[in-house]
């Protein structure tokens, strides 16, 4: 299915890191998404060093306080994990996509030949990541989240992508209009302002 096909809402089910590093749990989540009618599932490829400094601080969890860096380290999995997930997505009849948070995770994601590359809102101003995504993704659709972003930041991100695409083609770029208020009032969506393919983010 074409992610930009008109007349059909394209449903991406967020798995993120909810698998907890267990392939068996990932299988269950993929199966559940497929059974619910999702077109695609999305994971997060996490490397702690791409996201935060080791001395960022602590987070309070049910088991007590833990270093935030250590928590992100726990979310790291082997490269083979996502190859297996992608293969299982194919078996279940859903597409595979993921969010990278830095250049290492991006390169690994591109090697997986995903259905799409989803850039998370905090990475909207990560211009080196956007530039490499545009240059190396070729025909892979790019979904760009825009939560808590100013219009000038969105324009700069799109300009960075366009400048780094060899063919300057923006037909397979979509903005994920992410109003960071869950759930967001309809009066705050302002969707008519956007003139490229738009997605909405519900939590």
Where are these predicted regions, by residue range?
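Catalytic cores and adjacent flexible loops of soluble metabolic enzymes
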Residues: 1-203
């Amino acid at each position: 299915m074409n992610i930009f096909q008109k007349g059909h809402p394209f449903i991406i089910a967020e798995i993120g890191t909810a698998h907890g590093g267990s392939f068996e749990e990932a299988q269950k989540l993929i199966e559940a998404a497929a059974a619910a009618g999702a077109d695609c599932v999305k994971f997060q490829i996490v490397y702690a060093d791409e996201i935060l400094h080791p001395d960022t601080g602590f987070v309070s969890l049910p088991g007590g306080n833990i270093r935030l860096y250590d928590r992100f380290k726990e979310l790291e999995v082997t490269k083979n994990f996502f190859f297996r997930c992608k293969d299982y997505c194919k078996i279940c009849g859903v597409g595979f996509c993921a969010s990278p948070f830095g250049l290492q995770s991006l390169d690994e994601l591109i090697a997986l030949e995903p259905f799409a590359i989803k850039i998370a809102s905090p990475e909207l101003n990560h211009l080196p990541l956007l530039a490499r995504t545009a240059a190396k993704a070729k025909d892979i659709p790019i979904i760009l989240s825009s939560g808590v972003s100013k219009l000038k930041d969105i324009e700069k991100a799109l300009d960075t992508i366009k400048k780094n695409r060899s063919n300057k083609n923006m037909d397979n770029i979509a903005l994920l209009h992410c109003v960071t208020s869950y759930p967001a009032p309809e009066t705050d969506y302002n969707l008519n302002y956007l003139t490229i393919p738009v997605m909405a983010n519900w939590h």
